[in-house]
UniProtKB/Swiss-Prot annotation:
The chain crosses the membrane at residues 35-55, 85-105, 120-140, 164-184, 211-231, 252-272, 284-304, 321-341, 355-375, 390-410, 426-446, 470-490. Belongs to the heme-copper respiratory oxidase family. This is Cytochrome c oxidase subunit 1. InterPro entries: Cyt_c_oxase-like_su1_dom (IPR023616), Cyt_c_oxase-like_su1_sf (IPR036927), Cyt_C_Oxase_1 (IPR000883), Cyt_c_Oxase_su1_BS (IPR023615), Cyt_c_oxidase_su1_bac (IPR014241). Cu cation binds at H258, Y262, H307, H308. The gene is ctaD. There is a cross-link at H258-Y262 (1'-histidyl-3'-tyrosine (His-Tyr)). It comes from Thermostichus vulcanus. GO terms for molecular function: cytochrome-c oxidase activity; heme binding; metal ion binding. Its main location: membrane. One of its GO terms (biological process) is respiratory electron transport chain. Keywords: Cell membrane, Copper, Electron transport, Heme, Iron, Membrane, Metal-binding, Respiratory chain, Translocase, Transmembrane, Transmembrane helix, Transport.
Length: 552
């Protein structure tokens, strides 16, 4: 994509860049987009471990029907905060804040984000939010689920519930600030030689994500502020006995929280569109279709939220409308899946760790999408609403989708961030354990849901015990899968093989600078002369010319 193809030879030692950041700079209040990106990733991963420990504790409780491993109130608090942490403090910050901050300026040829100080502020709102969330356990912990529906959220552990609300508002503010920054950066700061049809697909995904967050997040903030007033100041926005309406809260909550699924998956789709062509050594199939499908998901995704409320007294016409809109939003997603499959077809695929997680994502997301189609239709959803069928669905989509994609991105861009390669043997072990653990844990939950086991309960009918025990064993396998990943990260960051500037032979602009990049990314800004996914085009052109010469 730049003027000159970078060599793929690997140096013997990591070069010293006088203008590169040192390790201790990552612990400071820094405005450089790369430092902030790493800070997002590391902080989010710490919360991922905390949320994962809560999940293991809950699965241990659910291993048997009469277990007393967790106090019921503590189980409810773990349930609430596990979901909250995994969504608001792991996937969203890692995908948008982590990869978005690190990669977008590098991919468009900018020296930093448009508003560096605003960028730093957006990150530094996250650690206090997480601390506030964890501190709520000193007051019993929020126990109303990650949805925090009233009236339950207004009568249980009200101090902890208020802390939960304030934490989410802080994270939402961070999201809004970051969205403004990404939109301005992509729109105004790409190098003059880069046309819109040369913009990397990850940047298209980040643009769509930012637009969606900017529209939906303030609605959640408004709904939570009203809930905070009901809890602490005697208002009655959601109190039916005083003229309020709890269904209004559901509308406000889901208007953000279903688009939040796309906030978590759109950047991951962008990562997929970068990883697959590089490691398949083929141009991406359907560049424009993938770019426009991100914008289509952004638009249609704002009109599907009521499928979470089919059992909340919604009228038939509303059920019909939102069933149709839910099925329509699957179309642009299908465009991406088929484009990735077409890109893989006939490619020279390198089955390294990044590519394995990308392919794993495709299989997991398709499985989750199939159950999503059934949940999007009102007649089926009414029967399996609030059962483990729903739990299985969203874990296949969000863990099998988002987390697999985050792992693919880490294995792909770790050499750029650190200058060193991750160990492939540990990476493949990590992938195998994660794939087995994911299916072992969540696939049996479909059976639990179809047989009627409700979600969010610590005690259940003994008939469900054998399947729950299977799920719990799978959860431990999934938990242990993180160990080789952590060993790989820590060891490779210090002792890993030197990567060189472009170990994968990538054509997007981040591969034209040093690894790790300079403080201002480049000594001289790059010039774009070809597309970001023109892999093998020159060889095919040479082959065509030779065939033409032979015919003559």
């Amino acid at each position: 994509m730049a003027q000159a193809q970078l060599p793929l030879d690997t140096p013997l030692s990591l070069p010293e860049h006088p203008k590169a950041w040192k390790w201790y700079d990552y612990f400071t209040f820094n405005v450089d987009h790369k430092v902030i990106g790493i800070q997002y990733l590391v902080t989010a991963f710490i919360f991922y471990l905390i949320g994962g420990l809560m999940a293991v504790a809950m699965r241990t409780e659910l291993a048997t029907a009469d277990s007393d491993f967790l106090d019921p109130n503590l189980y409810n608090a773990f349930l609430t905060n596990h979901g909250t942490i995994m969504i608001f403090l792991w996937v969203v910050p890692a995908a948008i804040g982590g990869f978005g901050n690190y990669l977008v300026p590098l991919m468009i040829g900018a020296r930093d984000m448009a508003f560096p100080r605003l960028n730093a502020l957006a990150f530094w709102l996250n650690p206090p939010a997480g601390a506030l969330l964890l501190a709520s356990f000193l007051f019993g912990g929020a126990q109303a689920g990650w949805t925090s529906y009233p009236p339950l959220s207004t009568i249980t552990a009200t101090t902890a519930q208020s802390m939960w609300i304030l934490a989410i508002i802080l994270v939402g503010t961070s999201s809004i600030l970051g969205s403004v920054n990404f939109i301005v950066t992509i729109w105004k700061m790409k190098v003059p030689s880069m046309r819109w049809n040369q913009l990397p697909l990850f940047c298209w995904a980040m643009l769509a994500t930012s637009l969606l967050a900017l529209v939906s997040t303030p609605v959640l903030a408004a709904g939570l502020i009203l809930l905070l007033f009901d809890i602490n100041f005697g208002t009655s926005f959601y109190k039916p006995d005083a003229g309020g309406n709890v269904v209004i809260y559901q509308h406000l909550f889901w208007f953000y929280s279903h688009p939040a699924v796309y906030l978590m998956i759109l950047p991951i789709f962008g990562i997929m569109s970068e990883v697959i062509p590089v490691h398949a050594r083929k141009p991406i199939f359907g560049y424009q279709a993938i770019a426009y499908s991100s914008l289509a998901i952004c638009c249609v995704g704002l009109f599907v939220w009521v499928h979470h409320m089919f059992t909340s007294g919604t009228p038939p016409w509303m059920r019909m409308f939102f069933t149709i809109s839910t099925l329509i939003v699957a179309v642009p997603t299908g465009v991406k899946i088929f484009s990735w499959v077409a890109t893989l077809w006939g490619g020279k695929i390198r089955l390294n760790s990044a590519m394995l997680f990308a392919i794993g994502l495709m299989s997991m997301f398709v499985l989750g999408g199939l159950s999503g189609v059934t949940l999007g239709t009102a007649p089926v959803d009414i029967h399996v609403h609030d059962t483990y069928y729903v739990v299985a669905h969203f874990h296949y989509v969000l863990f099998g989708g988002s987390v697999f994609g985050l792992y693919a991105g880490i294995y792909h861009w770790f050499p750029k961030m650190t200058g060193r390669l991750l160990d492939e043997r540990l990476g493949i072990l990590h992938f195998v354990l994660t794939l087995i653990g994911t299916n072992w844990t969540f696939l049996p939950m479909h059976e639990l849901g179809l047989k009627g086991m409700p979600r969010r309960v610590a005690m259940y009918d003994p008939q469900f015990e054998p399947v729950n025990l299977i799920c719990t064993i799978g959860a431990f396998v999934l938990a242990f899968s993180i160990i080789p990943f952590l060993i790989n990260i820590i060891w490779s960051w210090n002792k890993g093989k030197i990567a060189g500037d472009n170990p994968w032979g990538g054509l997007t602009l981040e591969w034209t600078t040093s690894s790790p990049p300079l403080i201002e990314n480049w000594e001289v800004l790059p010039v774009v002369t070809k597309g970001p996914y023109d892999y093998g085009i020159e060889r095919r052109q040479e082959s065509t010319d030779e065939d033409h010469d032979e015919q003559e």
